[in-house]
Amino acid sequence: MDVNPTLLFLKVPAQNAISTTFPYTGDPPYSHGTGTGYTMDTVNRTHQYSEKGKWTTNTETGEPQLNPIDGPLPEDNEQSGYAQQDCVLEAMAFLEESHPGIFENSCLETMEVVQQTRVDRLTQGRQTYDWTLNRNQPAATALANTIEVFRSNGLTANESGRLIDFLKDVMESMDKEEMEITTHFQRKRRVRDNMTKKMVTQRTIGKKKQRVNKRSYLIRALTLNTMTKDAERGKLKRRAIATPGMQIRGFVYFVETLARSICEKLEQSGLPVGGNEKKAKLANVVRKMMTNSQDTELSFTITGDNTKWNENQNPRMFLAMMTYITKNQPEWFRNILSIAPIMFSNKMARLGKGYMFESKRMKLRTQIPAEMLASIDLKYFNESTRKKIEKIRPLLRDGTASLSPGMMMGMFNMLSTVLGVSILNLGQKKYTKTTYWWDGLQSSDDFALIVNAPNHEGIQAGVDRFYRTCKLVGINMSKKKSYINRTGTFEFTSFFYRYGFVANFSMELPSFGVSGINESADMSIGVTVIKNNMINNDLGPATAQMALQLFIKDYRYTYRCHRGHTQIQTRRSFELKKLWEQTRSKAGLFVSDGGPNLYNIRNLHIPEVCLKWELMDEDYQGRLCNPLNPFVSHKEIESVNNAVVMPAHGPAKSMEYDAVATTHSWIPKRNRSILNTSQRGILEDGQMYQKCCNLFEKFFPSSSYRRPVGISSMVEAMVSRARIDARIDFEAGRIKKEEFSEIMKICSTIEELRRQK
């Protein structure tokens, strides 16, 4: 069925149609090549915004650093990072005055979290800069490598698995005169193949020990690796994002925990909540301003945009905020929270892979690694690149650039929100002491400002005062990109408010369609997305029904599984026809086996296998759900799985869907080509870690435990658990005496092996 899209708009109010103007269909743009240029842009811009600050040299690393704090008062209309420390502290004090006890209580909550968090918190997250290998790794591997190096250097606090103990190790590691690390390298040699008698190149992976002096180690520990941010819509230029290493991550986590706890208590904060809860919070603030503006006052709203939020923030500012927020707390707690901002004010940015050069004439391609940029002759570069390199040279060392000011994307979202809210908080009449007043919403760098005043001059004065107050703490509201409207119509974090929030449906468009995991998961995710959008995004019944039909069409096209009696000829349709002819109850066939679609908008919550179970032929049931069927090679599947869906905007969201194991929930095999590269050793470490954890989960099926990290403790825990379980099973008569004694023997053998090792 082909659909005429204009039908969608017959009864749609104009403001709801805004979503169709968004650039959110089709594939988002991805970056190719290196991010070196983008990173240099970031470093140069950040220094430019703070250029009137003071230059100093870091005594430990010898790196040049720029400190703009308490620099010249900024001019109107120029973006700058010259935050005034006393202004920031005063904003914090007023925030505390308006919310008595807020910092105290948040500190207590955070202290509890600090005591309880295990080091495996750090295994969450994707790519992490691995300082031992000087490149990105999955978080779990990077953590395991760091702990392994710490242990071989005599640091053992982390055996117990508490994050705070791991952080003690990090602090101690920075005092060591040198660290010994293990790096992977590969050797190539030519050998004669016995079978073919040809010469072949054989690669072997070696591990070698390397000593790093204090200064080099500090530089590595303070390094953020950079990558290009992918899939950003609506932008012409790409930009760089940072991945910090394991030394920084734990400290950042605790700072953000404290800031999150504060944000939860602030009505103007758009973080950490999301979705419908966020909309309710925002609607409250708007309601408050509109009721108060009665008939005597005007109320206007600015849909705000800040210029280069991250590059004008300053870690030294965050240090001042932390010092104030934790002012009456125990010393150890204050120290732990001050380390992240201190590390950030001494950070180094890795420039990435470097530049690719091509000579069309000589058919040559060569890569200039970032390490060479400090010394290479600039005549090879075009003018814009030449300027970039000249500017960054004084800051370069071994392919990293010293970057003291600025925050890099996405590191302190919660804490910077607290700073933004503290300025919104100053808009109360008791602080403005005049006829205008303001309030608003802040979510990381995005804000909406609502100003009330008796007349237009008052509104203008209020906006000016807000603008200048922001300047004092290093927030630069962009006059070009912010616009003002009568209160009742504005946009905030891509929510459009028009006397209530309008569903911006186009944001969800990219998540409709076939995910490409496997036949079973794709069907389940597809219908769940439609169901969720009916609940949350005003997807009406008629449109949902149409979305469902389009999804089924897309699904059949993807898996080449048109109905069994179709005329479409593909390699697969031949088999599906045979299946169709020999099936008695054709309604019971999965859509992916050429069956009919039985979904409609009333039964989207039921997995397909349950929906059709009663209609299936018995032998079909047996094939689909028989654990002995060699094709059912799936993991033990819980009743709920998580899919990653990409909304058009913001981070990928995790969405739960029902997972029922059948022959169709296969797992594709991984590409094994990695085995011939130097990554092989790393991959094996990662798999070993995974295997240990899986084994451990078999022993402790309750969901209450947290993964331990010290391998020694894992083995001991499993052995003692095995002994207890065996005794209980033996006494209850579930296992025979021989089995019981065999288990005991195995346990003793394991312990014996550990002792010998």
UniProtKB/Swiss-Prot annotation:
<dbReference type="GO" id="GO:0042025">
    <property type="term" value="C:host cell nucleus"/>
</dbReference>
<dbReference type="GO" id="GO:0000166">
    <property type="term" value="F:nucleotide binding"/>
</dbReference>
<keyword id="KW-0548">Nucleotidyltransferase</keyword>
<dbReference type="GO" id="GO:0019083">
    <property type="term" value="P:viral transcription"/>
</dbReference>
<keyword id="KW-0597">Phosphoprotein</keyword>
<keyword id="KW-1262">Eukaryotic host gene expression shutoff by virus</keyword>
<dbReference type="GO" id="GO:0003723">
    <property type="term" value="F:RNA binding"/>
</dbReference>
<dbReference type="Pfam" id="PF00602">
    <property type="entry name" value="Flu_PB1"/>
</dbReference>
<comment type="similarity">
    <text>Belongs to the influenza viruses polymerase PB1 family.</text>
</comment>
<keyword id="KW-0693">Viral RNA replication</keyword>
<keyword id="KW-1035">Host cytoplasm</keyword>
<keyword id="KW-1048">Host nucleus</keyword>
<dbReference type="GO" id="GO:0006351">
    <property type="term" value="P:DNA-templated transcription"/>
</dbReference>
<feature type="short sequence motif" description="Nuclear localization signal">
    <location>
        <begin position="187"/>
        <end position="195"/>
    </location>
</feature>
<dbReference type="GO" id="GO:0003968">
    <property type="term" value="F:RNA-directed RNA polymerase activity"/>
</dbReference>
<protein>
    <recommendedName>
        <fullName>RNA-directed RNA polymerase catalytic subunit</fullName>
        <ecNumber>2.7.7.48</ecNumber>
    </recommendedName>
</protein>
<comment type="function">
    <text>RNA-dependent RNA polymerase which is responsible for replication and transcription of virus RNA segments. The transcription of viral mRNAs occurs by a unique mechanism called cap-snatching. 5' methylated caps of cellular mRNAs are cleaved after 10-13 nucleotides by PA. In turn, these short capped RNAs are used as primers by PB1 for transcription of viral mRNAs. During virus replication, PB1 initiates RNA synthesis and copy vRNA into complementary RNA (cRNA) which in turn serves as a template for the production of more vRNAs.</text>
</comment>
<dbReference type="InterPro" id="IPR007099">
    <property type="entry name" value="RNA-dir_pol_NSvirus"/>
</dbReference>
<feature type="domain" description="RdRp catalytic">
    <location>
        <begin position="286"/>
        <end position="483"/>
    </location>
</feature>
<keyword id="KW-1195">Viral transcription</keyword>
<dbReference type="InterPro" id="IPR001407">
    <property type="entry name" value="RNA_pol_PB1_influenza"/>
</dbReference>
<feature type="short sequence motif" description="Nuclear localization signal">
    <location>
        <begin position="203"/>
        <end position="216"/>
    </location>
</feature>
<keyword id="KW-1191">Eukaryotic host transcription shutoff by virus</keyword>
<keyword id="KW-0945">Host-virus interaction</keyword>
<keyword id="KW-0696">RNA-directed RNA polymerase</keyword>
<dbReference type="GO" id="GO:0030430">
    <property type="term" value="C:host cell cytoplasm"/>
</dbReference>
<feature type="region of interest" description="Disordered">
    <location>
        <begin position="50"/>
        <end position="79"/>
    </location>
</feature>
<dbReference type="GO" id="GO:0039523">
    <property type="term" value="P:symbiont-mediated suppression of host mRNA transcription via inhibition of RNA polymerase II activity"/>
</dbReference>
<keyword id="KW-0547">Nucleotide-binding</keyword>
<dbReference type="GO" id="GO:0039657">
    <property type="term" value="P:symbiont-mediated suppression of host gene expression"/>
</dbReference>
<keyword id="KW-1190">Host gene expression shutoff by virus</keyword>
<comment type="subunit">
    <text>Influenza RNA polymerase is composed of three subunits: PB1, PB2 and PA. Interacts (via N-terminus) with PA (via C-terminus). Interacts (via C-terminus) with PB2 (via N-terminus); this interaction is essential for transcription initiation.</text>
</comment>
<dbReference type="GO" id="GO:0039694">
    <property type="term" value="P:viral RNA genome replication"/>
</dbReference>
<keyword id="KW-0808">Transferase</keyword>
<feature type="region of interest" description="Promoter-binding site">
    <location>
        <begin position="249"/>
        <end position="256"/>
    </location>
</feature>
<keyword id="KW-1104">Inhibition of host RNA polymerase II by virus</keyword>
<feature type="compositionally biased region" description="Polar residues">
    <location>
        <begin position="55"/>
        <end position="64"/>
    </location>
</feature>
